[in-house]
Amino acid sequence: MAYITDLVKGPIPLNQLSKPNKKQQVNIFAMGDVGSTLLSGLFLLGGDRIHTIGIWDMNPDLIYRLETEYRQISTATHSRSFPEVKGLSRDEFFRGDVAVFCASASVPSLDYTKEDVRMMQWNRNRTLVEEWAKRGVASGFRGWMAIVSDPVDLLCKAAFMAARGMDSSWGPDRIRGYGLGVMHGRGCYYSRLDPRFGSYEKEGRAFGPHGKGLVLANSVTHYDEEVSLELTQKVVEANLVAREKGYKPFIAPAIASGALSIIDTLAGQWNYSAVYLGNQQQSAYFGMLNRLGSKGTEVESLNLPEGLYLRLQQSYEELCRRY
Protein backbone atom coordinates (compact mmCIF):
# COMPACT_ATOMS: atom_id res chain seq x y z
CA MET A 1 0.00 0.00 0.00
CA ALA A 2 1.21 3.50 -0.80
CA TYR A 3 0.10 7.14 -1.02
CA ILE A 4 -0.06 9.33 -4.10
CA THR A 5 2.57 11.64 -2.60
CA ASP A 6 4.99 8.68 -2.66
CA LEU A 7 5.29 9.24 -6.41
CA VAL A 8 7.84 11.97 -5.63
CA LYS A 9 10.64 12.05 -3.08
CA GLY A 10 10.93 15.40 -1.34
CA PRO A 11 8.10 17.16 -3.20
CA ILE A 12 8.13 20.95 -3.46
CA PRO A 13 5.54 22.26 -0.97
CA LEU A 14 2.39 23.93 -2.30
CA ASN A 15 2.03 26.76 0.19
CA GLN A 16 1.93 30.05 -1.75
CA LEU A 17 -1.80 29.87 -2.49
CA SER A 18 -4.35 29.57 0.32
CA LYS A 19 -8.12 29.65 0.63
CA PRO A 20 -9.37 33.22 0.10
CA ASN A 21 -11.31 34.84 2.94
CA LYS A 22 -13.37 37.16 0.75
CA LYS A 23 -15.18 37.16 -2.59
CA GLN A 24 -12.94 37.12 -5.65
CA GLN A 25 -12.79 38.54 -9.16
CA VAL A 26 -12.49 35.77 -11.74
CA ASN A 27 -11.47 36.81 -15.28
CA ILE A 28 -12.10 34.55 -18.29
CA PHE A 29 -9.75 34.76 -21.28
CA ALA A 30 -11.53 33.88 -24.58
CA MET A 31 -15.30 33.50 -24.77
CA GLY A 32 -15.75 30.61 -27.17
CA ASP A 33 -18.00 27.62 -26.46
CA VAL A 34 -16.12 26.65 -23.30
CA GLY A 35 -15.53 30.18 -22.03
CA SER A 36 -19.16 31.22 -22.56
CA THR A 37 -20.50 28.09 -20.86
CA LEU A 38 -18.04 28.56 -18.01
CA LEU A 39 -19.37 32.09 -17.61
CA SER A 40 -22.92 30.73 -17.24
CA GLY A 41 -21.85 28.28 -14.55
CA LEU A 42 -19.83 30.79 -12.55
CA PHE A 43 -22.59 33.40 -12.83
CA LEU A 44 -25.42 31.12 -11.70
CA LEU A 45 -23.53 29.15 -9.05
CA GLY A 46 -20.68 31.34 -7.84
CA GLY A 47 -22.39 34.31 -6.21
CA ASP A 48 -21.25 33.33 -2.72
CA ARG A 49 -17.57 33.24 -3.76
CA ILE A 50 -17.26 35.63 -6.71
CA HIS A 51 -18.10 39.35 -6.82
CA THR A 52 -17.07 40.02 -10.44
CA ILE A 53 -16.53 37.94 -13.57
CA GLY A 54 -14.32 39.76 -16.04
CA ILE A 55 -14.50 38.67 -19.67
CA TRP A 56 -12.12 39.21 -22.58
CA ASP A 57 -12.29 38.07 -26.18
CA MET A 58 -10.82 39.14 -29.51
CA ASN A 59 -14.35 40.01 -30.64
CA PRO A 60 -15.48 43.23 -28.88
CA ASP A 61 -19.07 42.72 -30.06
CA LEU A 62 -19.19 39.41 -28.21
CA ILE A 63 -17.88 41.05 -25.04
CA TYR A 64 -20.57 43.73 -25.35
CA ARG A 65 -23.31 41.17 -25.89
CA LEU A 66 -22.33 38.95 -22.95
CA GLU A 67 -21.82 41.87 -20.58
CA THR A 68 -25.16 43.42 -21.55
CA GLU A 69 -27.21 40.23 -21.41
CA TYR A 70 -25.82 38.99 -18.11
CA ARG A 71 -26.38 42.38 -16.49
CA GLN A 72 -30.05 42.05 -17.42
CA ILE A 73 -30.49 38.89 -15.33
CA SER A 74 -32.25 39.29 -11.97
CA THR A 75 -34.76 37.48 -9.80
CA ALA A 76 -38.15 39.04 -9.11
CA THR A 77 -37.36 39.66 -5.44
CA HIS A 78 -33.59 40.25 -5.79
CA SER A 79 -33.15 37.35 -3.38
CA ARG A 80 -30.06 35.92 -5.08
CA SER A 81 -26.63 37.46 -5.36
CA PHE A 82 -25.07 37.23 -8.83
CA PRO A 83 -21.55 38.31 -9.73
CA GLU A 84 -21.20 41.43 -11.86
CA VAL A 85 -20.14 40.61 -15.43
CA LYS A 86 -17.64 43.13 -16.73
CA GLY A 87 -16.02 43.42 -20.16
CA LEU A 88 -12.26 43.90 -20.01
CA SER A 89 -9.62 45.28 -22.31
CA ARG A 90 -6.49 43.19 -22.84
CA ASP A 91 -4.52 45.49 -20.55
CA GLU A 92 -7.10 45.08 -17.78
CA PHE A 93 -7.26 41.31 -17.91
CA PHE A 94 -4.80 40.51 -15.13
CA ARG A 95 -6.41 42.96 -12.69
CA GLY A 96 -8.21 40.34 -10.66
CA ASP A 97 -7.74 37.36 -8.37
CA VAL A 98 -8.13 34.41 -10.74
CA ALA A 99 -7.16 34.39 -14.43
CA VAL A 100 -8.84 31.59 -16.40
CA PHE A 101 -7.30 30.48 -19.71
CA CYS A 102 -9.92 29.17 -22.18
CA ALA A 103 -8.21 30.09 -25.45
CA SER A 104 -7.42 27.58 -28.18
CA ALA A 105 -5.41 28.10 -31.35
CA SER A 106 -7.36 25.37 -33.11
CA VAL A 107 -9.90 22.65 -32.41
CA PRO A 108 -9.73 19.54 -34.64
CA SER A 109 -12.67 19.15 -37.00
CA LEU A 110 -15.43 16.66 -36.26
CA ASP A 111 -14.15 14.24 -38.88
CA TYR A 112 -10.94 13.79 -36.88
CA THR A 113 -11.61 10.75 -34.68
CA LYS A 114 -8.38 8.75 -34.86
CA GLU A 115 -6.78 9.65 -31.54
CA ASP A 116 -6.96 11.92 -28.51
CA VAL A 117 -7.92 15.28 -30.00
CA ARG A 118 -6.60 17.04 -26.90
CA MET A 119 -3.02 16.26 -27.84
CA MET A 120 -3.58 17.63 -31.35
CA GLN A 121 -3.85 21.06 -29.74
CA TRP A 122 -0.69 20.86 -27.64
CA ASN A 123 1.94 22.66 -29.71
CA ARG A 124 -0.15 25.65 -30.78
CA ASN A 125 -1.87 26.10 -27.43
CA ARG A 126 1.49 25.84 -25.69
CA THR A 127 2.67 28.98 -27.48
CA LEU A 128 -0.54 30.78 -26.54
CA VAL A 129 -0.41 29.87 -22.86
CA GLU A 130 3.29 30.72 -22.53
CA GLU A 131 2.72 34.19 -23.98
CA TRP A 132 -0.34 34.62 -21.75
CA ALA A 133 1.50 33.59 -18.58
CA LYS A 134 4.43 35.89 -19.36
CA ARG A 135 2.02 38.77 -19.87
CA GLY A 136 0.48 38.03 -16.49
CA VAL A 137 3.82 38.08 -14.70
CA ALA A 138 4.92 41.23 -16.54
CA SER A 139 1.70 42.98 -15.51
CA GLY A 140 2.39 42.30 -11.83
CA PHE A 141 -0.51 39.84 -11.48
CA ARG A 142 -0.78 38.76 -7.84
CA GLY A 143 -3.44 36.07 -8.15
CA TRP A 144 -3.44 32.57 -9.62
CA MET A 145 -4.05 31.02 -13.03
CA ALA A 146 -6.62 28.36 -13.92
CA ILE A 147 -5.97 26.44 -17.14
CA VAL A 148 -9.07 25.01 -18.84
CA SER A 149 -7.82 24.59 -22.43
CA ASP A 150 -6.46 21.27 -23.72
CA PRO A 151 -4.23 19.53 -22.89
CA VAL A 152 -4.72 20.92 -19.38
CA ASP A 153 -1.88 19.20 -17.55
CA LEU A 154 0.84 19.98 -20.08
CA LEU A 155 -0.35 23.56 -20.52
CA CYS A 156 -0.11 24.05 -16.75
CA LYS A 157 3.53 23.00 -16.87
CA ALA A 158 4.19 25.27 -19.85
CA ALA A 159 2.55 28.22 -18.10
CA PHE A 160 4.51 27.57 -14.92
CA MET A 161 7.85 27.33 -16.71
CA ALA A 162 7.10 30.56 -18.57
CA ALA A 163 6.09 32.35 -15.37
CA ARG A 164 9.04 30.99 -13.38
CA GLY A 165 11.37 32.04 -16.20
CA MET A 166 10.36 35.66 -15.58
CA ASP A 167 9.98 35.50 -11.81
CA SER A 168 11.87 32.82 -9.88
CA SER A 169 9.62 33.33 -6.84
CA TRP A 170 6.49 32.27 -8.72
CA GLY A 171 5.04 29.26 -6.85
CA PRO A 172 3.85 26.20 -8.78
CA ASP A 173 0.57 26.18 -6.85
CA ARG A 174 -0.38 29.52 -8.43
CA ILE A 175 -1.27 27.52 -11.53
CA ARG A 176 -3.94 24.82 -11.47
CA GLY A 177 -5.53 22.74 -14.21
CA TYR A 178 -9.23 22.08 -14.65
CA GLY A 179 -9.98 19.07 -16.84
CA LEU A 180 -10.43 16.10 -14.51
CA GLY A 181 -13.85 17.02 -13.13
CA VAL A 182 -15.69 15.94 -16.27
CA MET A 183 -13.80 12.64 -16.37
CA HIS A 184 -15.08 11.94 -12.87
CA GLY A 185 -18.52 13.01 -14.06
CA ARG A 186 -18.35 10.60 -16.98
CA GLY A 187 -17.30 7.85 -14.60
CA CYS A 188 -20.40 8.57 -12.54
CA TYR A 189 -22.49 8.55 -15.72
CA TYR A 190 -21.32 5.08 -16.71
CA SER A 191 -21.68 3.83 -13.14
CA ARG A 192 -25.40 4.60 -13.38
CA LEU A 193 -25.73 2.85 -16.73
CA ASP A 194 -23.87 -0.37 -15.96
CA PRO A 195 -24.01 -2.18 -12.58
CA ARG A 196 -20.45 -3.47 -13.10
CA PHE A 197 -19.30 0.11 -12.56
CA GLY A 198 -21.88 0.87 -9.88
CA SER A 199 -19.38 1.34 -7.05
CA TYR A 200 -17.60 4.22 -8.78
CA GLU A 201 -19.97 7.05 -7.89
CA LYS A 202 -19.55 6.60 -4.12
CA GLU A 203 -16.25 4.74 -3.80
CA GLY A 204 -14.29 5.52 -6.96
CA ARG A 205 -11.66 8.13 -7.80
CA ALA A 206 -10.18 9.79 -10.87
CA PHE A 207 -6.50 10.67 -11.25
CA GLY A 208 -4.06 12.04 -13.77
CA PRO A 209 -4.57 13.78 -17.11
CA HIS A 210 -8.00 13.95 -18.68
CA GLY A 211 -6.98 12.05 -21.81
CA LYS A 212 -4.24 9.52 -22.41
CA GLY A 213 -2.92 8.45 -19.02
CA LEU A 214 -6.22 8.92 -17.19
CA VAL A 215 -6.64 6.57 -14.23
CA LEU A 216 -10.07 5.71 -12.85
CA ALA A 217 -10.49 3.35 -9.90
CA ASN A 218 -13.86 1.63 -9.55
CA SER A 219 -13.36 1.74 -5.76
CA VAL A 220 -10.56 2.69 -3.41
CA THR A 221 -11.77 0.18 -0.82
CA HIS A 222 -12.71 -2.73 -3.11
CA TYR A 223 -10.44 -2.08 -6.06
CA ASP A 224 -10.95 -4.26 -9.14
CA GLU A 225 -8.26 -3.73 -11.76
CA GLU A 226 -10.16 -5.26 -14.68
CA VAL A 227 -13.32 -3.27 -14.02
CA SER A 228 -11.32 -0.08 -13.43
CA LEU A 229 -9.41 -0.42 -16.70
CA GLU A 230 -12.64 -0.98 -18.63
CA LEU A 231 -14.30 2.03 -17.02
CA THR A 232 -11.23 4.17 -17.71
CA GLN A 233 -11.28 3.19 -21.38
CA LYS A 234 -14.96 4.08 -21.75
CA VAL A 235 -14.40 7.48 -20.16
CA VAL A 236 -11.33 8.24 -22.28
CA GLU A 237 -13.22 7.34 -25.46
CA ALA A 238 -16.37 9.30 -24.55
CA ASN A 239 -14.98 12.39 -26.27
CA LEU A 240 -14.46 10.51 -29.55
CA VAL A 241 -17.91 8.92 -29.30
CA ALA A 242 -19.47 12.36 -29.00
CA ARG A 243 -17.55 13.65 -32.01
CA GLU A 244 -18.67 10.64 -34.06
CA LYS A 245 -22.24 11.66 -33.21
CA GLY A 246 -21.58 15.02 -34.82
CA TYR A 247 -20.86 17.40 -31.96
CA LYS A 248 -17.95 18.69 -29.93
CA PRO A 249 -18.67 18.16 -26.23
CA PHE A 250 -18.07 21.31 -24.22
CA ILE A 251 -21.02 21.74 -21.83
CA ALA A 252 -20.03 19.06 -19.31
CA PRO A 253 -16.32 20.00 -19.39
CA ALA A 254 -17.04 23.71 -18.89
CA ILE A 255 -19.40 23.07 -15.98
CA ALA A 256 -17.93 19.99 -14.25
CA SER A 257 -14.22 20.60 -14.82
CA GLY A 258 -14.50 24.38 -14.93
CA ALA A 259 -17.24 26.20 -13.05
CA LEU A 260 -17.98 23.71 -10.27
CA SER A 261 -14.33 22.90 -9.61
CA ILE A 262 -13.17 26.53 -9.62
CA ILE A 263 -15.97 27.49 -7.21
CA ASP A 264 -15.06 24.56 -4.95
CA THR A 265 -11.41 25.65 -5.06
CA LEU A 266 -12.36 29.14 -3.89
CA ALA A 267 -14.54 27.64 -1.16
CA GLY A 268 -11.79 25.37 0.15
CA GLN A 269 -13.81 22.28 -0.80
CA TRP A 270 -12.50 19.04 -2.25
CA ASN A 271 -12.34 19.25 -6.04
CA TYR A 272 -10.77 17.50 -8.99
CA SER A 273 -7.99 19.59 -10.48
CA ALA A 274 -4.40 19.22 -11.60
CA VAL A 275 -1.83 20.40 -9.06
CA TYR A 276 1.95 20.44 -9.15
CA LEU A 277 3.60 17.24 -8.02
CA GLY A 278 7.36 17.26 -8.25
CA ASN A 279 10.84 18.04 -6.96
CA GLN A 280 13.95 19.56 -8.51
CA GLN A 281 14.51 16.52 -10.75
CA GLN A 282 11.06 15.80 -12.20
CA SER A 283 7.59 17.27 -12.06
CA ALA A 284 4.15 17.30 -13.63
CA TYR A 285 0.74 18.76 -13.00
CA PHE A 286 -1.27 15.74 -11.94
CA GLY A 287 -5.02 15.56 -11.46
CA MET A 288 -6.38 14.40 -8.11
CA LEU A 289 -8.76 15.37 -5.34
CA ASN A 290 -7.38 18.35 -3.45
CA ARG A 291 -8.48 21.46 -1.61
CA LEU A 292 -7.17 24.84 -0.54
CA GLY A 293 -6.72 25.51 3.14
CA SER A 294 -5.22 28.26 5.25
CA LYS A 295 -1.73 26.75 4.86
CA GLY A 296 -1.86 25.84 1.17
CA THR A 297 -2.96 22.93 -0.99
CA GLU A 298 -3.95 19.66 0.65
CA VAL A 299 -4.14 16.52 -1.49
CA GLU A 300 -6.34 13.61 -0.51
CA SER A 301 -4.33 11.11 1.51
CA LEU A 302 -5.48 7.62 0.56
CA ASN A 303 -3.73 4.35 1.23
CA LEU A 304 -3.79 3.03 -2.33
CA PRO A 305 -3.92 -0.63 -3.44
CA GLU A 306 -0.70 -1.74 -5.12
CA GLY A 307 -2.27 -2.21 -8.56
CA LEU A 308 -3.78 1.27 -8.49
CA TYR A 309 -0.55 2.86 -7.30
CA LEU A 310 1.39 1.23 -10.14
CA ARG A 311 -1.07 2.68 -12.66
CA LEU A 312 -0.63 6.12 -11.12
CA GLN A 313 3.14 5.76 -11.20
CA GLN A 314 3.08 4.89 -14.90
CA SER A 315 0.77 7.81 -15.69
CA TYR A 316 2.84 10.29 -13.69
CA GLU A 317 6.14 9.21 -15.23
CA GLU A 318 4.65 9.48 -18.72
CA LEU A 319 3.52 13.06 -18.01
CA CYS A 320 7.00 13.91 -16.76
CA ARG A 321 8.50 12.51 -19.97
CA ARG A 322 6.14 14.54 -22.18
CA TYR A 323 7.34 17.78 -20.62
What positions do the PLM features span?
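Short helix-capping segments at alpha-helix termini
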Residues: 46-48, 74-78, 164-173
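Conserved N-terminal Rossmann-fold NAD(P) cofactor-binding segment
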Residues: 2-5, 9, 56-96
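Rossmann-like NAD(P)-binding element
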Residues: 81-144
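Rossmann-like dinucleotide-binding core of oxidoreductases
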Residues: 144-222
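Long, compositionally biased stretches enriched for glycine and/or charged residues
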Residues: 191-323
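Conserved active-site and cofactor/substrate-binding residues in soluble primary-metabolism enzymes
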Residues: 33, 37, 61, 124-127, ...
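NAD(P)+-binding Rossmann beta1-loop-alpha1 motif at the extreme N-terminus of oxidoreductases
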Residues: 2-65
